[in-house]
């Protein structure tokens, strides 16, 4: 069943069922077009990066204006991809009771669950974001050094010190505020070849003291500030080329419909899918719903040239006149457009995904 057919069935379901009786269908086949086995049940929404909100707003605006867009290319990031996943850090701090030992401000194991990434997907981007905290009016000191390494052996989860391996990045930072981005696509080569289920990194932030930082009064201890405000996330962009095929079916050019056009003839009808009616508003961040539409109406032979019909529909109408056993041409979508959805799954991953053929734009006989 095509995605728009599932949504059409869902729309009629919402129209015919009494209010409040749609929740039992959340775990049905209707969720499969999202790639979900069941409806997620997050306790609360994770913070959504500005870039993801910018992407979803731009795509909604393009869809509303009818502008063409390649949803398998993420213009804001400059990469190919039709699935964006924001994976939260699920790691833990080390030695939080003894800061400033040998200049070390804090150490943390960053842990990212990669099981949400599909095996057949092609990795096109992996960007780690470290948020050191909100920017301040103060010229925060001291200067910091951020060291990011691969964890070879995690040891006992949350209790033992991990075995640190290859150094990935060593970067100086003016102060404990703002965001840092790191390209981890090279570090995820092992995932691409071995399909690893997780990524473990060792983060250490060191204080680079100088004479200025020792004499300047700071509003608070920089290490205390980092321990309280440090936040890490991994943005992964993947591409499944099978979901990026342009439609190759050619149709006869539509002829202007004459005045007095009968509303019983094949045409597009409006159908709005409201996610709140389904209970999906609990995990779908944006949009709140969308106009899916559907096709309905008759396809009489005398009107096939006016109903955006395919060549095959025209021939089928002729064959039906000669032999009534041949089925009539039926009203079907002739042009479909995609949508993008931003949602959160049960593992707290924020996902921006592109879905082909979700909105009926035009109808015709076929």
Swiss-Prot record:
Q: What is its main location?
A: secreted
Name the phenotypic consequences of knocking out this gene: Embryonic lethality in one-third of the mutant embryos because of pregastrulation developmental malformations. However, the majority of mutants survive until adulthood without any overt abnormality. Mutant mice shown resistance to diet-induced obesity.
Q: Which residues form the propeptide?
A: 23-252
Kindly give the InterPro entries that the UniProt entry links to this protein.
Cystine-knot_cytokine, TGF-b_C, TGF-b_propeptide, TGF-beta-rel, TGFb_CS
Entry PTM: Synthesized as large precursor molecule that undergo proteolytic cleavage, releasing the pro-domain from the active, receptor binding, C-terminal region of the molecule.
What Pfam families does the record point to? TGF_beta, TGFb_propeptide
Where is this protein found? Answer: Secreted; Cytoplasm
UniProt keyword list: Cytokine, Cytoplasm, Developmental protein, Disulfide bond, Glycoprotein, Growth factor, Secreted, Signal
Q: Do you know what upregulates this one?
A: Markedly increased in an obese-mouse model lacking adipocyte fatty acid-binding protein FABP4.
> What does the record list as GO biological process?
endoderm development; eye development; formation of anatomical boundary; in utero embryonic development; mesoderm development; negative regulation of BMP signaling pathway; negative regulation of epidermal cell differentiation; negative regulation of myoblast differentiation
Q: Which residues form the signal peptide?
A: 1-22
Disulphide bond pairs? 266-331, 295-363, 299-365
Q: What else is known?
A: In contrast to other members of this family, cannot be disulfide-linked due to an atypical cysteine knot configuration, where the fourth cysteine is missing. This fourth cysteine is involved in an inter-molecular bridge to stabilize the active form of homodimeric or heterodimeric signaling molecules.
**Subunit architecture:** Homodimer. Heterodimer (Potential). But, in contrast to other members of this family, cannot be disulfide-linked.
Functional note:
Growth factor involved in early embryonic development and adipose-tissue homeostasis. During embryogenesis controls formation of anterior visceral endoderm and mesoderm and the establishment of anterior-posterior identity through a receptor complex comprising the receptor ACVR1B and the coreceptor CRIPTO. Regulates adipose-tissue homeostasis and energy balance under nutrient overload in part by signaling through the receptor complex based on ACVR1C and CRIPTO.
**Which family is annotated?**
Belongs to the TGF-beta family.
Cross-referenced PANTHER family: GROWTH_DIFFERENTIATION FACTOR 3 (PTHR11848:SF38), TGF-BETA FAMILY (PTHR11848)
Its name, as the record gives it, is: Growth/differentiation factor 3
Organism for this UniProt entry? Mus musculus
């Amino acid at each position: 069943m095509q995605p728009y057919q599932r949504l059409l069935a869902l729309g009629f379901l919402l129209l015919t069922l009494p209010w409040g009786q749609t929740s039992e269908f959340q775990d049905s086949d209707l969720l499969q077009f999202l790639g979900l086995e069941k409806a997620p049940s997050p306790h609360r929404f994770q913070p959504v990066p500005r870039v993801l909100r910018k992407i979803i707003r731009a795509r909604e605006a393009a869809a509303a204006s009818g502008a063409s867009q390649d949803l398998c290319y993420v213009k804001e990031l400059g990469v190919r991809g039709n699935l964006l996943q924001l994976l939260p850090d699920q790691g833990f701090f080390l030695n939080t009771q003894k800061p400033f030992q040998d200049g070390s401000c804090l150490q943390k194991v960053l842990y990212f669950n990669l099981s949400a990434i599909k095996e057949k997907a092609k990795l096109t981007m992996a960007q780690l974001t470290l948020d050191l905290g909100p920017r301040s009016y103060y010229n925060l000191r001291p200067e910091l050094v951020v060291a990011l390494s691969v964890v070879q052996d995690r040891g006992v989860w949350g209790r033992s010190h991990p075995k640190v391996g290859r150094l990935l990045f060593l970067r100086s930072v003016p102060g404990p505020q703002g965001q840092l981005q790191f390209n981890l696509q090279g570090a995820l080569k092992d995932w691409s070849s071995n399909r690893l289920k997780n990524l473990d990194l060792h983060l250490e932030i060191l204080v680079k003291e100088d004479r200025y930082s020792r004499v300047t009064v700071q509003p608070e201890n920089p290490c205390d500030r980092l321990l309280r405000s440090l936040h890490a996330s991994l943005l992964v962009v993947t591409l499944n080329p099978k979901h990026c095929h342009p439609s190759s079916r050619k149709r006869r050019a539509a002829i202007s419909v004459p005045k007095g056009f009968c509303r019983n003839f094949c045409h597009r009808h409006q159908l709005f899918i409201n996610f709140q009616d389904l209970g999906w508003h609990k995990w779908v961040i944006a949009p709140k719903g969308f106009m899916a539409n559907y096709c309905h109406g008759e396809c009489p032979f005398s009107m096939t040239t006016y109903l955006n019909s395919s060549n095959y529909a025209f021939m089928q109408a002729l064959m039906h006149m000669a032999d009534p056993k041949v089925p009539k041409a039926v009203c079907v979508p002739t042009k479909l457009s995609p949508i993008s959805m931003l949602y959160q799954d049960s593992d707290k991953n924020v996902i921006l995904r592109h879905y082909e053929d979700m909105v009926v734009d035009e109808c015709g006989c076929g």
